[in-house]
């Protein structure tokens, strides 16, 4: 059963509805040389609705907010030109030292890393192949082995290189899947299900001389995941920059073996005739990613979890007294977004509003609040949810926003219980 694909489809449908209702500001802006100390508020100028993010690190909601130190690093980098290749090399070497891996590359997000890492596996022994993928593949190995339960929407980034997936479900099938066309074995770290675990996946692939790629995009915290998988033997691992690490949204990390990271860089910008030319990473994103790694490594898993639980408990405390309402705090039992979430349940015969309707009410209100899209879903995102569960993602809330979320939830639910 491919639970994740259905979950992702539900999320993508939610994203499409969100975008459809957003509208776009039209018209050219007049030039204005005036500068305010913090810059002009272009959200206000463009008529874009600001939101309170009680959902999580979703791309459609602009992911995370960069900490002050990261914002400052990005702003400072924007003021001075440098040689891009020198910056990428220096940043990669620095990040690799900090994350205990052979090499690293700052990419244009985790999806970009999937494409570049795959291209690296396809072209490392044949540099002319850089110019041939994804169409001229007669002499290029292009089969990627994956567990059937690990197929997901984001593997399109791998198919961008002209690959063909070979799906397996058992160890016997996995052993038999390798041939002269096999170029990579792919593992989706947050997949629900799959008969073959990480260590066995790596062991078998390496026995056949094939590199392993682990997509762990949303899988920090815990902090140690940033080196756990490379130390486990995965040749390539990717993390999103704009999720738990709190870097720029359009940045990511590709970590792994020196040979493969070097090959990934050859398939990347600023080289023109490559599959990664459009995946440009600017100096601001590179510096921001380095600064985010520095910031993230000053945190602790225990400290972050305690803060997130505190926010959830504060919201739950302000919902007491609503008939039949019960609140619990839960962590997903999958690797992605493994942080405390607040789950709210009630008797729909007593509180006469559906979780989806609550989500819409908070979205339409002022300030506009986005709840986690697994609200009203069965086992959403690895959480113990059902059709009658409101899910509040507390980890992207900013100071004081938990009280606003609690107030709006209480207003909507109390009115429905009247």
Which residues make up each language-model segment?
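Conserved N-terminal alpha-helix of the aminotransferase class I/II PLP-enzyme fold
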Residues: 67-109, 120
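Conserved PLP-enzyme active-site core in the AAT-like
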Residues: 12-15, 21, 36-52, 56-61, ...
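Conserved PLP-dependent catalytic core of the aminotransferase class-I/II
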Residues: 298-331
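Conserved C-terminal alpha-helix-loop-beta "cap" of PLP-dependent enzymes
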Residues: 320-413
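Generic N-terminal amphipathic, Lys/Arg-enriched alpha-helix
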Residues: 50-60, 71-77, 339-343
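N-terminal secretory signal peptides
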Residues: 1-7
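Bacterial Sec-dependent signal peptides at the C-terminal "C-region" and cleavage site
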Residues: 26-35
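Short glycine-rich or small-residue beta-strand-to-loop segments that form or flank ligand, phosphate
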Residues: 60, 73-78, 102-108, 145, ...
């Amino acid at each position: 059963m491919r639970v994740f694909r259905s979950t992702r489809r539900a999320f993508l449908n939610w994203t499409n509805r969100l975008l459809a209702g957003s509208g776009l500001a039209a018209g050219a802006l007049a030039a204005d040389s005036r500068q305010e100390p913090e810059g002009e508020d272009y959200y206000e100028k463009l008529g874009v609705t600001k939101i309170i993010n009680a959902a999580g690190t979703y791309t459609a909601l602009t992911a995370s907010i960069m900490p002050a130190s990261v914002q400052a690093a990005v702003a400072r980098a924007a003021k001075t030109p440098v040689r891009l290749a020198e910056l990428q090399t220096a940043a990669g070497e620095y990040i690799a030292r900090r994350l205990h891996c052979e090499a690293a590359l700052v990419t244009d997000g985790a999806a970009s890393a999937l494409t570049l890492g795959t291209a690296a596996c396809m072209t490392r022994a044949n540099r002319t192949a850089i110019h041939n993928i994804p169409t001229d593949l007669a002499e290029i190995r292009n089969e990627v082995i994956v567990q059937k339960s690990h197929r997901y929407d984001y593997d399109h980034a791998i198919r961008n290189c002209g690959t063909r997936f070979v799906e397996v479900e058992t160890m016997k099938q996995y052993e038999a899947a390798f041939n002269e066309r096999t170029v990579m074995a792919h593992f989706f770290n947050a997949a629900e299900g799959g008969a073959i675990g990480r260590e066995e996946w790596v062991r078998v692939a390496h026995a056949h001389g094939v590199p392993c790629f682990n997509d762990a995009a949303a899988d920090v915290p815990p902090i140690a995941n940033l080196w756990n998988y490379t130390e486990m033997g995965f040749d390539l691992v990717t993390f999103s920059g704009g999720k738990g690490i709190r870097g720029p949204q359009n940045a990511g990390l590709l970590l792994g073996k020196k040979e493969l990271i070097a090959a990934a860089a050859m398939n990347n910008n600023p080289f023109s005739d490559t599959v990664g030319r459009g995946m440009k990473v600017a100096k601001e994103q590179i510096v921001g990613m380095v600064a985010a790694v520095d910031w993230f490594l000053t945190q602790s898993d225990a400290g972050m979890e305690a803060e997130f639980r505190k926010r959830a408990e504060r919201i739950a405390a302000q919902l007491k007294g609503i008939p039949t309402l019960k609140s619990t705090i839960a962590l997903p039992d999958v690797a992605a977004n493994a942080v405390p979430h607040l789950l709210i349940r009630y008797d729909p015969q007593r509180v006469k509003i559906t979780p989806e309707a609550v989500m819409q009410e908070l979205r339409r209100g002022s300030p506009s609040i986005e709840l986690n899209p697994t609200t009203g879903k069965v086992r959403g995102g690895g959480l113990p949810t059902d059709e009658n569960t409101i899910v509040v993602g507390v980890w992207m809330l900013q100071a004081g926003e938990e009280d606003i979320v609690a107030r709006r939830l209480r207003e909507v639910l109390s009115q429905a219980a009247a």
